[in-house]
């Protein structure tokens, strides 16, 4: 038996409806699953963009790593690094696209000494993400 990958990572948000809209409309991530609006409901009955349930999964690709937008009742969102890195094949174009949509960046895309390009951006709750263009030989 071995670990074969990462299935889901969680991002704590202050409002899952607003976060769902931002992650889909601004970042362009596809919805993988929206859970039922009521806790302990039949999991086959999905929620909607207007009335999302506690469990929201975003993501695509093979293998797919999903992002769970998690609104914790009674907990304050603590802004800071998430450790989550989004990949792109053209960081300069993606930086410009996201900037036009109002995304706040901590820095400009920069080529690192090992050949990858990186920059950091924030969601509306102050969660920090990396944007990376892999080294292209």
Model-derived regions, located:
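Short hydrophobic/aromatic beta-strand element in the GNAT-like acyltransferase core
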Residues: 55-57, 66, 85, 118-120
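Core segments of cupin and vicinal oxygen chelate
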Residues: 4, 10-64
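Vicinal oxygen chelate
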Residues: 1-2, 8-11, 95-137
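Eukaryotic phosphotyrosine signaling hubs
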Residues: 6-8, 80-84
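Helix N-cap motif at beta-to-alpha junctions
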Residues: 15-16, 89-92
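Short amphipathic alpha-helices within nucleic acid-binding modules
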Residues: 22, 92-97
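Acetyl-CoA-dependent GNAT
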Residues: 33-35, 61-62, 70-74, 107, ...
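Exposed loop/turn and edge beta-strand positions of beta-sandwich/beta-sheet ligand-binding modules
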Residues: 52, 80, 115
């Amino acid at each position: 038996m071995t670990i074969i990958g990462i299935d889901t990572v969680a991002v704590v948000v202050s409002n899952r409806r607003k976060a769902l809209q931002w992650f889909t409309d601004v970042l362009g991530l596809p919805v993988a699953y929206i859970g039922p609006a009521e806790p302990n409901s039949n999991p086959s009955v999905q929620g909607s963009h207007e009335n999302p349930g506690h469990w929201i999964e975003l993501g695509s690709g093979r293998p797919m790593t999903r992002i769970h937008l998690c609104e914790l009742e009674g907990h304050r969102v603590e802004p800071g690094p998430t450790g989550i890195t989004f990949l792109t094949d053209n960081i300069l174009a993606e930086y410009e696209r996201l900037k036009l949509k109002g995304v706040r960046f901590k820095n400009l895309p920069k080529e690192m000494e090992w050949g990858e390009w990186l920059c950091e951006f924030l969601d509306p709750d102050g969660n920090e993400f990396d944007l990376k263009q892999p080294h292209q030989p």
